């Protein structure tokens, strides 16, 4: 049996643009993709912290160091510029591989610059945010 596991996430990024008429995808600063080990064309889920919307799309590389995180195509109806989002990548693996998995969690600031990279998906990324009291630290 294969399990679908979170392999990477870019946590609490700020949407810099939304383009309804662009071919669908999410444009992500190449530095963020590299830090998260997310490939160009890889399927990702986007969770909008601001409004609760969830969607799946694929990544395209944005200019390195630009901080770009652009929502393209029909998804622009669901996510607005300035929204805070989480990009999540998943992978399928055996139970043994899943138990050994150390996901890449990229924490960013409001300008989408990397603040920290770790393997704990429950770690609070910034002051004022807390780990759920129900979550077990990784």
Swiss-Prot record:
Pfam families found in the cross-reference section: Asp_decarbox
Location within or outside the cell: Cytoplasm
Gene3D superfamilies per the UniProt record, alphabetical: 2.40.40.20
Co-factor: note: Binds 1 pyruvoyl group covalently per subunit.
Enzyme class, first EC level, given as a word: lyase
Biological-process GO terms, alphabetical: alanine biosynthetic process; pantothenate biosynthetic process
Binding site for substrate: 57, 73-75
Record CDD domains: Asp_decarbox (cd06919)
Sequence similarity: Belongs to the PanD family.
Function, in words: Catalyzes the pyruvoyl-dependent decarboxylation of aspartate to produce beta-alanine.
Name the UniProt record assigns to this protein: Aspartate 1-decarboxylase
Species this chain originates from: Clavibacter michiganensis subsp. michiganensis (strain NCPPB 382)
UniProt lineage: Bacteria, Bacillati, Actinomycetota, Actinomycetes, Micrococcales
């Amino acid at each position: 049996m294969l399990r679908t596991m979170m392999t990477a996430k870019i946590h609490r990024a700020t949407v810099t643009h939304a383009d309804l008429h662009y071919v669908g995808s999410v444009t992500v600063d190449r530095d963020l993709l590299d830090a998260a080990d997310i490939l160009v064309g890889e399927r990702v889920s986007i969770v909008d912290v601001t409004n609760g919307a969830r969607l799946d799309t694929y990544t395209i590389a944005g200019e390195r160091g630009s901080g770009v995180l652009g929502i393209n195509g029909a998804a622009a109806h669901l996510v607005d510029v300035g929204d805070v989002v989480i990009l999540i990548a998943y992978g399928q693996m055996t139970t043994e591989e899943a138990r050994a998995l150390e996901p890449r969690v990229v924490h960013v600031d409001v300008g989408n610059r990397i603040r920290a990279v770790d393997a704990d998906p429950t770690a609070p990324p910034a002051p004022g945010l807390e780990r759920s009291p129900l979550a077990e630290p990784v």
